[in-house]
């Protein structure tokens, strides 16, 4: 006999209690019991349709359900737009690209959220008859991937990148990319992503590389890309330039010790100190305040505010540098804050962005005293000479951060009156968001993209139709980067810049698609017979190539069929953290290079955090592999994964301890469908998503509820089911469940159009569990299970047959339509159950997949609208029932027929 309370919920007399909310994390260890694993043992060749004629297992098992289906879908080409031959097809397209995951490692739950959301949108449109294209891909992730490979080589073989030639090192990176890329694609398949694998795209594939080169050359030819010496953000650990957007500013309220890559001990930051420069040719001195005393070796001036009465007498005079013996002019500029420190500031144009602008206005020289590796350079001078002491340079191998105390000591010895002020109100310390490396402003020749004109052009074409109504988000969308974008990186892994140093009497740089093109072009232009061109060794910023993804993945710059049919994309769905890194750059580059926006809409989702609300980080031990949730994993295996990673010993201990606390018994097997449904059940916009395994486990229980429902349904269905439209007069509760089905379809329809997937999942869960199982099935169960002999005894055979026919027909259609509604979220279990249900349907559908069946829409169910039905007795019950659902607990009364 079918047991509705299949999850062992407490049964009170005459009442079933069902909790709508997810279980708490504390309940997880109590409620989870290891389930018997059931294996699909049929000898089905890969890519062949699964055999659903086998007996339905007694309980739900993800491993059984999820076997074979994906291989069949993929081999049959159900995910390709060429599949657009459905009877219900419409003349519309729906296209989007998956935000290409970095090949730095495997996917985490944040990626799983992206897949769950995008696949739900894609599968629904495909079922609606749209011609759908969803392209998979991976990003080469220059800085991140090179760093990971360098760590691996150092850990495994004790070798640094500098021990390899560029060609040898790139061979190691490609080896890493191939391993990681395959694993990422395996994860995407296990997540059920209905991607068109025949169009998979990697950002360093030959075709994509041609697109990158073409984009660079076109932008260079139009003057939007140029090479110039400028003050850039420099990572001393990477020895590379970094774009402004990759720099985080951490606020320091005073003296702070920070860990910096390349240093064993923490380095002091946030201490303001004051020292005095002696006036040249006059008695007195000018005291300046700074948090960077080591950069005073590159000072070229002292600046004061023109209206500051304290310094009126020294305008135009000079100070003498105590170490380098240079004369420093005292200049006036309104940018100086009279209230900060002494009101006089040292000017170091080569190591401070504000000072760089001062040097432009006042024609000051720029002296670089810190090298690209973070060490002091020879131009610091023989700065102890004024004391007639032995010559002591700032050794080149001595890191600048450790030099502060030495400089301060010497300043005191030279009577420059050093005063420490530890109570600094606030200071913004720039650091690289990826590694925590302190960013050093350095003067370097780099390649830049001029963004101002592109940003204006994008805004003029109403660059996006915002999906959000809040003013904050609307303003955020319009904050396109207007400062010039540094796109050159001093790395080995990435797209080598298609620019060439051309040697002739006066050397110059020019861009070109190939070196042959450059030599030919320059020969014609200049007239020299022998020209030697040397390729620029730098590579492009990863975000430059990623910004081309929406059209480069379709074959641009060639006018391919895909580009003509599927560009621009229907929607871009991505994490809210990528709006400036990726979204803004795609908008500018797409508008400039293709003349139109790369997508019509943008949908942003929040970040996934752990159940404590913490950002997921490998060093915290809370990064979860989606496959570990799908298959289940022991604590021991989780700990092994941490040991196999690149964490340092201290971080490894922290991560392993966190795992022991959060997953004392490991992670139970939840399955793909449960994970996807749990992720889509969260509101995507607004606050970040705090996900716990217990929430996913609750969704696995829902899968079991679906399984048991179908098991019961298959047990009561006859050979053929009567279509609902031909039933004629039906019972009031039958009409009620039909109206609930219509309302659910209408609610899903509306929520899908506004991308509120949490509303869709909530409506589907509520209908299946509360309306269908807890009310309708409990009501019709006596009719469906009553034997014909009993009906004869009660002389009610005709009435019994009629009631049974109505109940089975309505039950079939409710279950079948619910499976179709749930299919975009739970593709595996819905396919398994739907295929088993179809032989009992009207006319027995052909052997087609559920993912290509028409998606239910309210216009097809207009006869089931409440206004078309009359059920006064049930109306009151429905109102009470829905009110109880609102209070998070449903009390389903076991009642006799309502008339």
Model-derived regions: residue spans:
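Basic, alpha-helical terminal appendages of large translation-related enzymes
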Residues: 2-91, 133, 689-690, 749-758, ...
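N-terminal, positively charged nucleic-acid-binding surface of large information/translation enzymes
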Residues: 2, 14-307, 331, 348-361, ...
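Long, charged, mostly alpha-helical binding arms that flank functional sites
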Residues: 143, 148-151, 155-159, 172, ...
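Structured ligand/cofactor/substrate-binding pocket environments in proteins
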Residues: 110-122, 129, 138-139, 203, ...
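Short Cys/His-rich metal-coordination motifs, predominantly Zn2+-binding knuckles/fingers
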Residues: 238, 324, 435, 503-505, ...
């Amino acid at each position: 006999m079918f047991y509705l309370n299949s999850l062992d919920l407490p049964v009170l007399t005459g009442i079933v209690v069902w909790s709508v909310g997810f279980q708490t994390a504390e309940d997880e260890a109590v409620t989870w019991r290891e389930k018997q694993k059931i294996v699909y043992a049929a000898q089905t060749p890969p890519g062949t349709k699964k055999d659903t004629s086998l007996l339905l297992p007694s309980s739900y098992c993800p491993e059984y359900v999820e076997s074979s289906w994906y291989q069949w879908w993929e081999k049959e080409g159900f995910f390709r737009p060429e599949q657009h031959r459905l009877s219900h097809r419409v003349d519309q397209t729906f296209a989007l690209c998956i935000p290409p995951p970095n090949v730095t490692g495997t996917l985490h739950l944040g990626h799983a959220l992206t897949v769950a959301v995008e696949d739900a949108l894609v599968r629904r449109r495909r079922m609606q008859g749209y011609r759908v294209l969803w392209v998979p891909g991976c990003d080469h992730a220059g800085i991140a991937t090179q760093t990971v490979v360098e760590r691996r080589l150092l850990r495994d073989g004790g070798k640094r990148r500098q021990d390899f030639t560029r060609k040898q090192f790139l061979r190691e990176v490609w080896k890493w990319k191939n391993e990681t890329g395959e694993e990422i694609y395996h994860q995407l398949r296990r997540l059920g992503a209905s991607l068109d694998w025949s169009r998979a795209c990697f950002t360093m594939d030959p075709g994509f590389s041609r697109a990158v080169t073409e984009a660079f050359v076109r932008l260079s030819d139009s003057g939007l890309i140029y090479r110039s010496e400028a003050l850039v953000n420099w990572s001393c650990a990477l020895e590379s330039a970094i774009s402004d957007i990759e720099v985080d500013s951490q606020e320091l309220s005073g003296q702070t010790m920070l860990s910096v890559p390349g240093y064993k001990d923490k380095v002091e930051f946030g201490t303001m100190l004051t020292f005095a420069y002696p006036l040249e040719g006059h008695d007195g001195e000018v005291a300046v305040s700074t948090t960077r005393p080591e950069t005073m070796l590159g000072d070229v001036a002292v600046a004061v505010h023109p209206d500051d009465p304290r310094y009126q007498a020294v305008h135009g005079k000079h100070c003498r540098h105590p170490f380098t013996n240079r004369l420093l002019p005292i200049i006036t500029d309104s940018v100086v804050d009279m209230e900060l420190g002494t009101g006089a500031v040292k000017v170091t144009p080569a190591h401070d962005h504000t000072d760089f602008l001062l040097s432009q206005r006042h024609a000051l020289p720029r002296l670089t005293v810190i090298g690209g590796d973070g060490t002091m350079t020879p131009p610091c001078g023989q700065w102890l000479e004024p004391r007639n002491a032995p010559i002591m340079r700032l050794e080149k191998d001595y890191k600048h951060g450790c030099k502060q105390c030495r400089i301060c000591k010497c300043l005191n010895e030279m009577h420059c009156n050093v005063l420490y002020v530890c109570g600094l109100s606030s200071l913004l310390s720039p650091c690289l968001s990826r590694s925590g490396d302190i960013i050093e402003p350095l003067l370097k020749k780099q390649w830049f993209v001029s963004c101002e004109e592109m940003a204006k052009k994008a805004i003029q074409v109403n660059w996006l139709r915002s999906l959000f109504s809040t003013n904050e988000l609307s303003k955020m969308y319009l904050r396109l980067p207007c400062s010039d974008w540094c796109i050159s990186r001093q790395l080995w892994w990435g797209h080598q810049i298609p620019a060439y140093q051309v040697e002739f009497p006066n050397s110059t740089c020019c861009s070109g698609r190939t070196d042959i093109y450059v030599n030919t072009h320059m020969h014609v232009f200049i007239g020299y017979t022998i020209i030697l061109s040397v390729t620029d060794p730098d590579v492009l910023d990863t975000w430059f190539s990623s910004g081309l993804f929406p059209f480069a993945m379709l074959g641009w710059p060639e006018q391919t069929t895909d580009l003509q049919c599927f560009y621009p994309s229907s929607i871009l769905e991505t994490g809210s953290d990528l709006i400036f890194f990726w979204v803004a750059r795609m908008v500018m580059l797409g508008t400039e290079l293709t003349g139109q926006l790369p997508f019509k809409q943008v949908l942003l989702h929040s970040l996934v955090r752990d159940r404590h609300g913490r950002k997921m980080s490998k060093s915290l031990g809370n990064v979860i592999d989606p496959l570990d949730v799908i298959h289940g994993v022991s604590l021991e295996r989780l700990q092994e994964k941490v040991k196999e990673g690149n964490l340092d010993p201290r971080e490894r201990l922290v991560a392993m301890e966190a795992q022991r606390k959060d997953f004392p018994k490991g992670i139970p097997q939840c399955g793909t469908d449960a994970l996807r449904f749990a992720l889509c059940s969260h509101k995507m916009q607004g606050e970040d998503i705090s996900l716990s395994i217990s929430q996913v486990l609750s969704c696995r229980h829902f899968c079991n509820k679906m399984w048991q429902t179908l098991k019961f349904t298959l047990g009561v269905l006859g050979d053929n089911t009567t279509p609902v439209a031909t039933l004629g007069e039906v019972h009031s509760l039958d009409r009620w469940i039909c109206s609930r089905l219509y309302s659910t379809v209408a609610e899903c329809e509306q929520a899908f159009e506004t991308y509120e997937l949490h509303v869709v999942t909530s409506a589907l869960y509520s209908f299946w569990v509360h309306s269908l199982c807890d009310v309708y099935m409990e009501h019709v169960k006596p009719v469906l299970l009553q034997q014909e002999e009993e009906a004869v005894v009660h002389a009610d055979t005709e009435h019994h047959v009629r009631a049974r026919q109505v109940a089975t027909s309505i039950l079939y259609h409710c279950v079948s339509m619910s499976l179709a509604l749930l299919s975009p979220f739970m593709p595996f279990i819905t396919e398994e159950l739907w295929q088993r249900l179809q032989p009992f349907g009207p006319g027995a559908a052909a052997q087609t997949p559920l993912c290509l069946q028409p998606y239910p829409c309210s216009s097809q169910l207009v006869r089931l609208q409440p206004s078309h039905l009359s059920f006064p007795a049930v109306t009151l019950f429905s109102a009470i029932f829905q009110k109880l659902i609102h209070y998070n607990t449903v009390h389903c009364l076991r009642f006799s027929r309502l008339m």
